[in-house]
Amino acid sequence: MACKRYLPPNRLAEFLKDIHPDSKKTIGFSVENRSIEMITIGTGPYTILMWSQMHGNESTTTKALFDFIPWFLDSDQELLQAKCTLYIIPQLNPDGSHRYTRQNASNVDLN
């Protein structure tokens, strides 16, 4: 699925479904009740937390994650998958993403 410049919350759901549907979990909800999703991949003892779009209008890292995830899931990366568990939150601020603003729905910059 091609990812354009801006990735609103509804498009994020499409990407999550296509990339790794079994590992998705809702970990919370935004001020405006949009789900905040996390993907867990890998089985190793080394844990890595990755998140993006803390600022809703900055989706470049989100798109990079969706390039990274298929690479990590490739069978060539089995050793890495066995050593690491990745917790990926691809859109930390879905309200800001929906509005295309840096702040969340409460006008708070999440930095």
Model-derived features: where do they sit?
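Residues at the C-termini of beta-strands that transition into short coil/loop
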Residues: 28, 42, 92
